[in-house]
UniProtKB/Swiss-Prot annotation:
Gene3D superfamilies: Glutaredoxin. InterPro entries: AGR/TXD, DsbH, Thioredoxin-like_fold, Thioredoxin-like_sf, Thioredoxin_domain. It is an enzyme of class 1 (oxidoreductase). It comes from Chlamydia pneumoniae. One of its GO terms (cellular component) is periplasmic space. This is Disulfide bond reductase DsbH. It comes from the Bacteria. Residues 32-166 form the Thioredoxin domain. Keywords: Disulfide bond, Oxidoreductase, Periplasm, Redox-active center, Signal. Its main location: periplasm. Pfam families: Thioredoxin_2. The lineage of its organism: Bacteria, Pseudomonadati, Chlamydiota, Chlamydiia, Chlamydiales. Residues 1-22 form the signal peptide.
Length: 166
């Protein structure tokens, strides 16, 4: 009888703490949403040919984003933590032409696009993902970077330094 009462008391205590844990979890989730910055406009992706043409006109560098969008964990982190940050989107909108060079495993990609992406991967000697390769309008490499933790603002600072931008 003594053990039965102790067991009931223990289970009762556990049941009483569940609402507190759930409320704490909800509150922390709400706080995360409230502190997340409002996203800037989406990145403007261009084809490689379009980016070269536009870069010849406005002299902005081209950023080739080599990614495995549906299987590469670090590519997905880079997309979420850096490329989709308001700081990076603003910077890219002002200073870059963005080209996604994707190597999906699950999602369908037209054969022509797959071949073009393979050519770009070979041309710029990309051996791992994710990788950003910055080029000029002539296709000359200016800089290259992979994923780095720290978020969009820190990454933009490193890109500016690598490209010698203010």
């Amino acid at each position: 009888m003594k053990f039965w009462l102790q067991g009931c008391a223990f289970v009762g205590c556990l049941l009483l703490t569940l609402p507190c844990c759930a409320a704490r979890r909800r509150a922390s989730g709400e706080n995360l949403q409230q502190t997340r910055p409002i996203a800037a406009a989406n990145l403007q992706w261009e084809s490689y040919a379009e980016a070269l043409e536009h870069s010849k006109q406005d002299h902005k560098p081209i950023c080739l984003f080599f990614t495995g969008s549906d299987w590469c964990m670090w590519c997905i982190k880079m997309q979420d933590q850096i490329l989709q940050s308001s700081e990076f989107k603003h910077f890219a909108g002002v200073h870059l032409h963005m080209v996604e060079v994707d190597f999906p495993q699950k999602n369908h990609q037209p054969e022509e696009q797959r071949q073009k992406n393979q050519e770009l991967k070979a041309q710029y000697k990309v051996t791992g993902f994710p990788e950003l390769v910055f080029i000029d309008a002539e296709g000359k490499q200016l800089a290259r970077m992979g994923f780095e933790p720290g978020g969009g603002a820190a990454y933009v600072s490193k890109v500016k330094s690598a490209l010698k931008l203010r």
